[in-house]
Amino acid sequence: MKKNGILNRELSYLIASMGHGDILSIVDSGFPISEDVFCVDLSLIAGKPKIVEIIIPLLEELEIEKVLIAEEIKMISPKYHQKLLSIFPKNVQIEYIPHEKFKDRVRESKGVVRTGEQTSYSSVILVGGVTYHGEKEEGL
């Protein structure tokens, strides 16, 4: 039995399979998900779990270099937008794109995590990073 970290088997698999530049989408309960994209459905009831509740433990296990967010969030859900921004490390690039383009990018995901979130334009795309940089000397 796994002792700590993310316990969900499918989500753990998805995290372990992420490479540099791969896309992992965390979406609200009503977001359209293509049948040909691997989906981990964590939705339980309306509003639970929230996207932020999923992202926080994900950040403990997954290196990300960029986050994509629908630009509409700034006007439609400004309080949620500020909360979302507060959970990402300062070195992570935040990029805003129109919601229609956002939906297209989700279709390129290695996987999608559906939550119970019901805040408008709350979905995010995480772009995988790397945990090492530059030349590494081994065995020399």
Curated annotation (Swiss-Prot):
The UniProt keywords, alphabetically, are: Carbohydrate metabolism, Cytoplasm, Isomerase
A GO cellular component term found in this entry reads: cytosol
The pathway that the record names for this protein is: Carbohydrate metabolism; D-ribose degradation; D-ribose 5-phosphate from beta-D-ribopyranose: step 1/2
Active site per database record: H20 (proton donor)
Q: Where does substrate bind?
A: D28, H99, Y121, S122, S123
What is the catalytic activity of this protein? beta-D-ribopyranose = beta-D-ribofuranose
**What EC number(s) does its UniProt record assign?**
5.4.99.62
Q: Which GO terms describe its molecular function?
A: D-ribose pyranase activity; intramolecular lyase activity; monosaccharide binding
User: Where does it localize?
Assistant: Cytoplasm
- What role does it play? Catalyzes the interconversion of beta-pyran and beta-furan forms of D-ribose.
Relate the assembly described in the record: Homodecamer.
Similarity remark: Belongs to the RbsD / FucU family. RbsD subfamily.
Q: What is this protein called?
A: D-ribose pyranase
